[in-house]
Curated annotation (Swiss-Prot):
GO terms for molecular function: histone demethylase activity; histone H3K36me/H3K36me2 demethylase activity; transcription coregulator activity; zinc ion binding. The lineage of its organism: Eukaryota, Fungi, Dikarya, Ascomycota, Saccharomycotina. One of its GO terms (cellular component) is nucleus. Binds 1 Fe(2+) ion per subunit. One of its GO terms (biological process) is chromatin remodeling. This is JmjC domain-containing histone demethylation protein 1. Histone demethylase that specifically demethylates 'Lys-36' of histone H3, thereby playing a central role in histone code. Belongs to the JHDM1 histone demethylase family. Residues 475-510 are annotated as: Disordered. It is an enzyme of class 1 (oxidoreductase). It comes from Yarrowia lipolytica (strain CLIB 122 / E 150) (Yeast). The keyword Nucleus applies. It is found in: Nucleus.
Amino acid sequence: MPNRCDFCTSSSTKDKQQWTQCDGCDRWVHDVCVSITDPVSYAKYHCPTCTKTKGPSLYKRQSKRKKIDIDYAAMHSGNVDMSLRTRHVHSSRFTDVAASAQNKEPFKRVSGTELTLDWAQSSDGLNEPVIVPKEYKDTLGMYIPEDLTVRQVAEAVGMESPVEVINVVSQNGSPGWNMGKWTEYYEDIEGRDTILNVISLEISASALGKTIVRPTLVRELDLVDRVWPTNTDAARESKPRVSLYALMSVEDSFTDFHIDFAGSSVFYHVLKGRKSFMFIRPTARNLAAYSQWCLSADQNVVFLPDVLSPDSDIYTVHLSPGDTMYIPSGWIHAVHSPQDSLVVGGNFITPLNMKTQIDIAGIEVRTKVPMKFRYPLFAGVMWYYVLQLLANPERLNTMSTKERDGLNSVAEYLSGFIKTMSPTMKDVQYRRFVANFPMEIRPFPGKTLLDYCAMLDFYPKGVQETVDIDIRKKKGESKEKHKIESQLPEEKILQGSKLESKEEVQTENF
């Protein structure tokens, strides 16, 4: 969102509610400061500076770039009716870049029979998005009702069930919606006066969700299904629910660039309509640029590919009804809906992408992603993974190289996670924190972590400090110290660990 005009002449805030972007330098200006009375009359607008170097503004001619008139003051104040009069500011730019010859889809379109667990575990398996076209959908080991409708989704979860609806222009939530109201909006094509989107309706616990079978590869890779306990009602109830979503988008919906929470992988099956994706390869340089973009005050008006280096890899994928796509861990992407669409998909953490998943969880902390948009109980999944490996150490001898390469990252992550414990945490923060620790490792989870490190023969710097950390929150009491008989051999303390400070290892923004 623009926050500065280089030509300010008025001190009145009221006069500065309308902005226009210069086509010459891309700066945003207050209309009142540059005497713009009718911004939509320009085919190409030049600010006073650009007028001197690029010539005057042009009127009533076809511009190469469609002008977008967005009331940012209304968006900022939450006035939804005023802010939803146009497309998302990046929709046209997305279409232009997607049409560029160098951004054509490079990814494989294959039969589902090729996407085996052995393939995923290989060095070149599931490193890039991969598409299974409609003609091969029966090879995925998947069942989703192909005639599913938005109304049937609503009936399955309950018409009165609340649903998170996204205001496409602002990319913020629009409160007060339930599935009944959403269904009426979606079906009333002529009556729509806004562009709204539903992308976070989790349906695995619904009657509909219980009839759906995810692709075989997803079920084989899903770490939560592998490690989360199911022996008690409480354990089953607390299991993270991210495996099945119904995504319902109207024409011209747009989701800005993002990475799925905690770097989780995605499967995505289109039932109705078409979807267009723009992917950015998750290189270290691109992830750094993405992090800076997320923190920028101008994020809403800056198209991410425009701030990447010219040689960055950007790819476009178009999906039609019946197509299925896998999105690997960490890929940055934006999504546009050229038509009304209905999609069933889901997220899954894998044991093959631990370092990437943990790195993305760290980016979420640094970019201040709200807790509601992070992977639920991510650290808890890591602990149950550790417990399973400790119970079956022989797995180290048979696991794939990809999985083994991520084990040290888990140790580093959990060492840092324990150290975020503070007796001064607010109650809600503490409850969120402690919920990640299985009962069998409380109140001193560092002992379990040390056992895991011993199994790996890998000791992150400072891991010994975790052994004495009691995660019980005690007010007005001295903390009992927990001692262990054996201490870490000094030569095992890693001096080169990247985890040098509490700030760097913090994994939850409590």
